[in-house]
Amino acid sequence: ITRENLKQFDGIFFYTTGMLLPDGDPREALMDFIKAGKGFVGTHSAADTFKKYQGYVSMINGSFAGHPWGGGSTNGFLNHEPNHPTVAMLGKEFIWKDEIYQYNNFDPNAVRVLFSLDMAKSKPQMPYHVPVCWVRNFGKGRVFFTNLGHNGSTWDNETYHKHLIEGFKWSLKLTDGPAEPNPELQAKESIKAFALFASQKMKLDHDKLLKDMMTKAGDEKFIKLLRENSWKSKGRDMNLIKAVLTELK
């Protein structure tokens, strides 16, 4: 990748891993390419690429932090934007067999999450929200990322082909679809994951807990605590879970 070579392209696709490019201008050239109005599409391990280069991590908005949902697992997904061209082919809810990442360095205020794990239909169940596909504006450019793409069966699936092709088209500005961040939706998804986990582990009334927690969906301090503690707990440290519940009293 060089600045001169990039001039011939309108977009770039990453299904990659590792550091790829040397320090300095090649990396900056890639970021400037997108910011200038070009398209970026990343699948699966694109979020396990350039993990030590903050410019890329910030652009894609996440870095690999494990995959509790391995390639042999079949999980449920919630499509939050069924009218968005990049995910319209998937329906409001769907089941898929693939390896699903969880992420460090994910900023809910930076991206529009299009679909997420449905913890009620996934194993293991974790107390935190796991985004799977998102879009964003990056400078004048567009970024589309989907975590799907580990399994060969995914690449053989015609629905996935449509998903990816529409991602390319959207990133190249050939179709329209919103990219404004949706942190409010993500906060509610965080609450839903936590309430499901806590009610099962601590034998609480799920519906009441969910209702009580939803009253605090707009409380930034509470949502920050919820996200931090649920992530740090890894579904094991119940003291961190209890600390969140204490804030409801």
Labelled PLM ranges:
Residues L225-L248:
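Alpha-helical adaptor scaffolds
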Residues G62, H67-K140:
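Catalytic beta-strand/loop cores that center a nucleophilic Ser/Cys/Thr
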Residues K121-V130, N137-L209, T215, I223-K224:
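Extracellular ligand-binding/catalytic regions of CAZymes and related secreted enzymes
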Residues G39-V41, L114, F144:
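Structural detector of well-ordered beta-strand residues that form the stable sheet scaffold
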Residues M19-R27, N157, H161, K234-M238:
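Solvent-exposed, acidic/flexible segments
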Residues N5-I12:
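Short acidic/histidine-rich motifs immediately flanking catalytic phosphotransfer sites
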Residues F14, M19-M89:
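A glycine-rich, often tryptophan-bearing local segment used as a flexible ligand/cofactor-contacting loop or short
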